[in-house]
From Swiss-Prot:
Forms homodimers. Interacts with ubiquitin-protein ligase UBE3A/E6-AP; this interaction stimulates UBE3A ubiquitin activity. Interacts with host TP53 and EP300; this interaction inhibits TP53 activity. Belongs to the papillomaviridae E6 protein family. This is Protein E6. One of its GO terms (cellular component) is host cell nucleus. GO terms for biological process: DNA-templated transcription; regulation of DNA-templated transcription; symbiont-mediated perturbation of host apoptosis; symbiont-mediated perturbation of host ubiquitin-like protein modification; symbiont-mediated suppression of host innate immune response; symbiont-mediated suppression of host type I interferon-mediated signaling pathway. Its main location: host cell.
Amino acid sequence: MESKDASTSATSIDQLCKTFNLSLHTLQIQCVFCRNALTTAEIYAYAYKNLKVVWRDNFPFAACACCLELQGKINQYRHFNYAAYAPTVEEETNEDILKVLIRCYLCHKPLCEIEKLKHILGKARFIKLNNQWKGRCLHCWTTCMEDLLP
């Protein structure tokens, strides 16, 4: 699945499938980090999270779940700006917190309203990584909290 012009090629899994007349189920794509093939479940998750396709040497790549989480951890250590509560995020972005695109810092899923409200009601901070606001989705929140349980 080589593209003649990577600069104008698909930027999402959905666009990639439309461009090359493929279904999500038949798409085969490698991880940009480890070069392993993504599973069908990982491809669906990547599309659901609306993550971008990366082009290298005119070939598309995505990221497997393991590498996404690893990159999330690396970003936390390398690109941490600061942590803040919702009012600070709203003040900085000049938008209501529910309208701000905030992704999970581990799995990179965009947070839904409920996940943002969980941060607010639980008095949890959002973190700014590489000048982008991040938080925790419900799945990663429970995974993180399991480590704290006896």
